[in-house]
Amino acid sequence: MRPLDVTPTISPGAQDLPRTMHFAAEPPLQPLIIDITEEEKLEITYIGKKLKRKYKSYDDPGFISMLHLNAYTLLPERIAKVLSNFGTDFSDQQYGAVVLRGLIEIGQDELGPTPRSWQETDHEKIMEYGFISSLLHGAVPSKPVEYFAQRKGGGLMHAIIPDENMSFTQTGSGSRTDLFVHTEDAFLHNAADFLSFLFLRNEERVPSTLYSIRSHGRPDAILQELFKPIYKCPKDANYASEEALGDDIRTSVLYGSRSAPFMRFDAAEQIYNEDANQDPEALHNLKRFWEEARKLIYNDFVPESGDLIFVNNHLCAHGRNAFLAGFREENGQLVKCERRLMLRMMSKTSLINIREVTHPENPYLIMEEHYGKVYSAHLANL
């Protein structure tokens, strides 16, 4: 990993980033980290509780239909401006991730013990955090969505919890192996535009890993090869092996601007999964790319309770280090602790552009299965 000197931050009270400011020529190597003030934290915490009392659930149609207005009306102005700028900045200096450090006060006693798996989540206990996450996406502006390919929808927000039965998998439920960096749902044409990861607990002190395509600078000859539509990507480890392979479709890893491209990439599935059966040229190109990319992975940020990472899924891949769930190290000794608990939300900037792959009765439920192939609508119990 390239040595880092100073973590970029916006100090408390600073306003939005001016569009005309001049950036250094060096490519960005780490996310912007914004320290939330105590006043902002109290305001956001209050907003979450207030919206829960009014709407009961963050997927209430009345709340979702007013999401963007609520975001600009209710969020602290500084945070709304940062996210609004973030949503339209695809420049060569945009890393593609923003950390909102100390965003919200998490009531640990009210939260109770971490469930054994996401299936046992008590959604009532995390409801107010769903409202807050939704508002942040609304400020981009972007609309929260759910994917049938993940938990058969499962709602607009997913609890990410280490599951002992899946501890060695390349999924959010894993823990005992490094989760390789990946853009979310790289096997879909209509993957999320933006992601948020709200950490309710990270007592094991697990670093989050981020990797931005912008960290390479202007694409060299190795990266230019990734514009070729020759790369396969199976579905992830949530699927049985035969089902995961899907159709034999090839796409590019990089797309969009040749000088400042977007990325669709999953290291685990495209490089380390032998069942992907990449063509020799494709695998050669991916391995050369990975040798460069892995040196640019940023994992110096250890989230604490109440921190949130906001990600542009077209620019920045995410993952995490391996850890032993329910234990942290203190003075060389393993000490028992509550297991990690994180909340993920995904969003799209346009429901119109994805309408052919969304459920006929629910434009927020994306039914894409694998690179344009769509699940039958009758599978979803609405």
From Swiss-Prot:
EC number(s) on file: 1.14.11.-
InterPro entries reported in the protein's UniProt record: TauD-like_sf
GO molecular function: 2-oxoglutarate-dependent dioxygenase activity; metal ion binding
Annotated residues for binding of Fe cation: 182, 184, 318
Biotechnology: Being totally regio- and stereoselective, this enzyme is of interest for biocatalytic purposes to produce chiral scaffolds that are of synthetic value in the preparation of more complex functionalized chiral molecules such as natural products and analogs.
Catalyzed reactions: L-lysine + 2-oxoglutarate + O2 = (4R)-4-hydroxy-L-lysine + succinate + CO2
Cofactor binding note of this UniProt entry: Binds 1 Fe(2+) ion per subunit.
Enzyme class: oxidoreductase
UniProt keyword Iron, yes or no: yes
Requisite cofactors: Fe(2+)
Keywords of this entry: Dioxygenase, Iron, Metal-binding, Oxidoreductase
Similarity field: Belongs to the clavaminate synthase family.
Protein purpose: Alpha-ketoglutarate-dependent dioxygenase that in vitro catalyzes the regio- and stereoselective hydroxylation of L-lysine, leading to (4R)-4-hydroxy-L-lysine. Cannot use D-lysine or L-ornithine as substrate.
Protein name per UniProt: L-lysine 4-hydroxylase
Organism: Chitinophaga pinensis (strain ATCC 43595 / DSM 2588 / LMG 13176 / NBRC 15968 / NCIMB 11800 / UQM 2034)
Native organism taxonomy: Bacteria, Pseudomonadati, Bacteroidota, Chitinophagia, Chitinophagales
